[in-house]
Amino acid sequence: MWVVLVVGILNKESDRGKVHTLRQKLQEIPSDLHELFRDILTRDSHDKDELVLCIQWVLFSKQPLSPEQLYHAIYASTNPRAVTDWDPEDITKDVVKRFILSSSKGLAEVTVSKEPKAQFIHESVRDFLFKENGLGKIWPELGGNFQGQSHERLKQCCLNYISVDVAEFLKGPDKLPRAPSQQAASLRKLATQMLPFLEYAMHNVLYHADTAEGGGISQAGFLDSFPLPR
């Protein structure tokens, strides 16, 4: 894994036309894998919020997210307007893949399978970040309760997403069709295409709230204001 990451770093340096600095760059790269992870994550502060959120989703989502779901999950927090500007014809699979690679600083990837998912490039990344509290050591301002705080933030991402005016965005009928009808099936398919993260957000907003509560973060205010059926 160290070799794979180092080759990627050197290739990026070469792509920038800095061939003469490759030897120096190689000497600067930590020889320990976990130190290399730390170096990658702290090399610059560009889009740090996006990086942390991407890592939180890959670490703590209830189930692995599709690339499109992760793209929307991140933007639901960092740039909500991008959710309603989503156009699958413009935001291609390649664009989403490059976004995930960039957001994660190269530590997450998209699987090559019939149903692609976003995951860490190797289990050692998860071990470093979670089991060894890598994020807490790198960014102590995130606090000692990183897992609880992460679920709190993921809950808020879900809440932001399900707060989108779906009817206006999808431009569907004024009156919702009956559930078993063909029209309803077509509307659900359109919603999945245009709002890929909607199903996950609806099904798991309370899961993340419950897990945050288990991590010591009170959800009393959230539950009081949440539109539960009476």
Label each region the model flagged.
Residues M1-R230:
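Leucine/isoleucine-rich amphipathic helices and adjacent mixed helix/strand linkers
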